[in-house]
Amino acid sequence: MNYGVLGVIRLALDFIGTKIAFRKSRLIRFPIDIRGRSFIDFGSNLTTGRYCRLEVYPIEHKKGILKIGDNVEINDFVHIAARLSVQIGNNVLIASKVFISDIQHGCYNSNKMFNDCYPDIPPKERSLFAESVFVG
């Protein structure tokens, strides 16, 4: 690939930042937004694109987790959110602009098992639902 002078400088800075902040990773391209880092298990040789978001919001201080396997490649603008458990297996490639999550703000089907699942109720007022997710 031909990165050009500025591309090579940016790549070098990303590599240095990776080795300082994410020692087991292959290359983290900055900026990256990480929330709940203590609940994230990074595998070895992780590669990310730019502008990724990795977030963990545990339920009532229980240990929610985002587990990323070995040799995973996550492209630009990927958003992964976990409340209970999201696991990315080994050797997984995730395309750009992908959203992976184990949480949702209700459903919109004819089975109205929850009273707050109607589209006219704002998402922040609906119950959160979580179910474990595995990609791999």
What residue spans do the PLM features occupy?
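Domain-scale signature associated with acetyltransferase and cell-envelope carbohydrate enzymes
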Residues: 1-102, 129-136
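Right-handed parallel beta-helix
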Residues: 89, 101-106, 120, 125
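Surface-exposed acidic, glycine/proline-enriched linker/cap segments
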Residues: 112-134
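Conserved SAM-binding loop
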Residues: 64, 105-112
